[in-house]
Amino acid sequence: MTDLLRIEDLHVGFATDAGAAPAVRGVSLRVGPGEVLALVGESGSGKTVTARSVLGLLPGTATVRGRVLLGDGTSEPEEDVLTASPARLRTLRGTHAAMVFQEPSTALNPVFTIGWQLAEGLRAHGRGGGKAERRALAVEWLDKVGIPDPATRADQYPHQLSGGQKQRAVIAMALALGTRLIVADEPTTALDVTVQAEILELLHRCRTDFGAAVLLITHNMGIVADLADKVAVMRAGRVVEQAPVRDLFAAPAHPYTRELLAAVPDFGTGGRPGPETADGEVRDVVRAAGLVVDYPGRLGRKGFRAVDGVSFEIRRGEVLGLVGESGSGKTTIGRAIAGLTAVTGGQLQLFGEPLTRKSRKSKTAGRIGYVFQDPATSFNPLLTIAESIAEPLVVHQRELGAKEIRARAESLLEAVHLPRVYADRYPHELSGGQRQRASLARALALRPELVVADEPTSALDVSVQAKVLDLFGELQRELGFAALFVSHDLAVVERVADRVVVLHRGRIAEEGPTSQVLGSPQDDYTRRLVAALPVPDPVRQARRQQPVQEGVAGS
C-alpha cells in the first residue's frame, strides 16, 4: 500500500535570542489511505509543529530539514512540502491535505457567509463549474457533514453557528476539494462531550464514506482509543514509541507511554468514597433552593436566564461535582456562591445564613476560595507568585506583619508541592500546571471552609492534570474544606467528587452519589453524556460503541 504522507527525519528549530531552539528532532511517520494515525504527547512535545509542517504552515523563523512527502495514494508520494514553491503549496493545500484547527473560528472569515467560503475554495481550485453550481455543491457538502438545514446555514456567518457546526463546516471545506489527508489538530478540545462525539463520528465517516486518511493531533487518550488505528507518542520533539492502537494500550513499551496512560482518568472504574462524618455533625456549607440567575439583555435585547430554579446542597467536607455542557449554568452557579454574580431569585444560604446583595461580600470574605479555569489570566503579571498568594492575607488579615505573610506564602507553596524559590518568580515564568498549583495555594491562603474550582484542569496536559487532581484530593482530605468542582469532564468528576449534580440548560437533570449517577444514570441527558465520553481503552470503547452502531444500522 502506498503512503499519502511520509515524513522522513524531520527536524524543526526556531530562532531565539539564545540561539536555535529545537522543537522537532528526527521525526519519521507514515500515513496510508484510510488510516488514522494519532500523534499524542504533552504541550511542547512537538505535535503541532509536526502537523503544521505537513501543510507548510511553519513561520519564517523556523529552520527545517528532512522531507515531508505528500501523495495521492495511487503511487509513491513525491511532492516535498518543504521544497515546494508558494504556488504549488496553495495547490497542495486542500487537494492533497487539509488542516482542521483546534478553534474553527480562526479558520473561518467572519465577514463572509459559510456557503460563500466553501464555494470560494472550490473556485480557487478550479472545481464546481459556475457560481450556481458551486453554491449547490456548498449546500450539498454542508448536508453531507450533518449540518441541519444546510441551505439556511450556507447563508449565515460563522458567529451564527455553534462550535460543532463551525468545525463541521471546516471539514466540509476539506472534503469538497477531494482531499485525501485531513490533519486534525486537537479538533474537539473546545467542544462539549456530546458535540465531541459527533465530530469524532464525522472524522470516522471521513475515511469510511469519503476515503480520507486522518493525522490526529490530541492529548485525549479516550479519543485515541475511539478513532485511531496507529499511535505515535512524542516527547521533547522525538517519537518515543509507535504501535497499533490496541498493542500500545495493552502493552506500552516506553516508560513515558506507560506514565502517560497511567495518568489518564479512566471513566467507569469507580470514584472516591464519600466523606466520613460523625452522627449529628452533618451541616450544609451551601444550600440553594429554587435558585435563579438572570443576565440582563443589552441594546434592547431580551435577557437570558442562566440558572432556572436549581436546588442543591454542599455538605461540610464533601466535594460536589457540577457537570454539564457549555451554557448549562455551571460557572454561573459557582460565581453566585462566591458572590461574584448576583442572584435573581430563590434562596442561597452560605454557612447557614441567607446570602443577599448587601451581605454577599461580608458572608463570603475569607471563607470561600476560588480556583479559576485559566490561571494565566487570574494572576497579575506584575506581581510575583508570593505577592499574588499573599494578597488575600494582606486584605483580610491586616494584623499580620510582612515577614509572617511572606512565611505563610512560602509555606503555601510547599503545601502545593512548589519549591520556595518559585515565590519570587512571575506568572509567565511558570508552566500551566505550576500556575494552577499556585492558584490553589492562593485559594487556600485564608483556610476557607469552601473552595469553588471552575474547570481547574481543563487547560492542562493529562499527566499535569493527574498531579493537580491528586494534590487537590490530598489537600481536601488534609484541610477538610468542602468543594464545588465544576467540570465538563465526567472522568475527572468521577475521580474527585462524592456527589454529582448534572445540569442541562440551567436546570438539574439528575443528582446523587457519583457512583450512582455516572454508573447507572436514570435521566436521558445524563445517559447521553456518559455514552458520548470515550474511554482510554480501545477494547472497552469498541464494546461501548457496538450498541450505538447496531442502533444506527437498524434504524
Where are these regions (language model features)?
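ABC transporter nucleotide-binding domains
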Residues: M1-F267, G274-V535, R540-S555
